[in-house]
């Protein structure tokens, strides 16, 4: 059984993240979405909220394949989380050349520390290439329409966060 790990902050999960998750499910039997927890960062959504939003979004977008997705938290190195959960693949999404430069450096470092873990790059679909969670949060905070950029459950949660 092939297990992939897909790490990020997912604050919030976007249509771009879901595009990468769909691609990862074509490569692996199971995909672990690993939410990085950083003590110095104050996310908009709690870990529990992000787990729920990833779950709801997966059910809505992936259908029966949502059962092949699990969500964990990790602090420290993603390679340690990958080893703990017996992942063989680390999935990374690429939006542009800037992402590629950074991700190649990370893949090189991770490959040195964990040669058994293969990094796989998935290019973003052009329709979601410009989406970032940071921009989504900014647009939502200013009352803009974020529906084109995030799953429906996330749009509702963002609207609730910024109306209170």
Curated annotation (Swiss-Prot):
Its cofactor is Mg(2+). Its EC number is 2.7.7.3. One of its GO terms (cellular component) is cytoplasm. Keywords: ATP-binding, Coenzyme A biosynthesis, Cytoplasm, Magnesium, Nucleotide-binding, Nucleotidyltransferase, Transferase. It is an enzyme of class 2 (transferase). GO terms for biological process: coenzyme A biosynthetic process. Substrate binds at residues 9, 41, 78, 92. The record marks 17 as: Transition state stabilizer. It catalyses: (R)-4'-phosphopantetheine + ATP + H(+) = 3'-dephospho-CoA + diphosphate. ATP binds at residues 9-10, 17, 93-95, 103, 128-134. Homohexamer. Belongs to the bacterial CoaD family. Reversibly transfers an adenylyl group from ATP to 4'-phosphopantetheine, yielding dephospho-CoA (dPCoA) and pyrophosphate. This is Phosphopantetheine adenylyltransferase. It comes from Brucella anthropi (strain ATCC 49188 / DSM 6882 / CCUG 24695 / JCM 21032 / LMG 3331 / NBRC 15819 / NCTC 12168 / Alc 37) (Ochrobactrum anthropi). The lineage of its organism: Bacteria, Pseudomonadati, Pseudomonadota, Alphaproteobacteria, Hyphomicrobiales.
């Amino acid at each position: 059984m092939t297990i992939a790990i897909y790490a990020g902050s997912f604050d919030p999960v976007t249509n771009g993240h879901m595009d990468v998750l769909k691609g990862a499910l074509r490569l692996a039997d199971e995909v672990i979405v690993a939410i990085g927890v950083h003590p110095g960062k104050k996310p908009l959504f709690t870990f529990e909220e992000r787990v729920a939003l990833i779950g709801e979004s997966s059910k809505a977008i992936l259908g029966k394949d949502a059962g092949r997705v699990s969500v964990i938290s990790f602090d420290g190195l993603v390679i340690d989380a990958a080893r703990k959960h017996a992942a063989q693949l680390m999935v990374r999404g690429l939006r542009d050349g800037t992402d590629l430069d950074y991700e190649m450096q990370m893949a090189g470092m991770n490959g040195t520390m964990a040669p058994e873990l293969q990094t796989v790059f998935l290019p973003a679909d052009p329709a979601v290439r410009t989406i970032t969670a940071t921009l989504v949060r900014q647009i939502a905070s200013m009352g803009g329409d974020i529906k084109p950029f995030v799953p429906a459950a996330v749009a509702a949660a963002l609207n609730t966060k910024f109306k209170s």
